[in-house]
C-alpha cells in the first residue's frame, strides 16, 4: 500500500529538499516535515497506461504556480484523482476511460474541486 512507502518518502523528501508524492488508494504528499493525504481517484487509474506520466506533467505545471512544492504535490493528487473519479462515471471501460480522463482533466472546474476534494493533513 502507499502507506508502506510513506517513511521512505519522508526520508527522500528530507534528503533532497523536494516534495514527494506517493500514489495508491490513498495518496500521500510530503516535504519530509508535513504529510498530507488525499483520497481521490479510482482503481481504473492503475489499469491504463499513461496516468503516471500525466501526473508528472501535471506536477510540473502545479509547481510553476504553487506557493510550495508540497502544495504542488497535493494539487496534483487532488486534480488527477477527481478527474479519475469523473472519468469512471462517464466511461467505466479501460479504453474509453483513458480518453475520458484527459477530457475530465481538461474540463475540471474550481467547483468540481471544492465539492469533491478529500484532503487530510496528518
Give residue ranges: language-model regions:
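Electropositive phosphate-/nucleotide-binding environments in soluble metabolic enzymes
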Residues: 3-6, 53, 70, 74, ...
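Structural motif
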Residues: 18-21, 27, 35-37, 56, ...
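Conserved phosphate/ATP/ADP-binding segment of small-molecule kinases
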Residues: 1-35
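Charged C-terminal helix
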Residues: 82-122
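Short, well-structured alpha-helical segments that form the helix of a local strand-helix-strand
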Residues: 8-13, 69-84, 101-102
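Glycine-rich beta-alpha junction loops
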Residues: 25-26, 42-43, 76-82
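Short, small-residue alpha-helix embedded
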Residues: 47-79
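Glycine/charged-rich beta-loop-alpha catalytic/anionic-binding loops adjacent to active sites
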Residues: 33-45
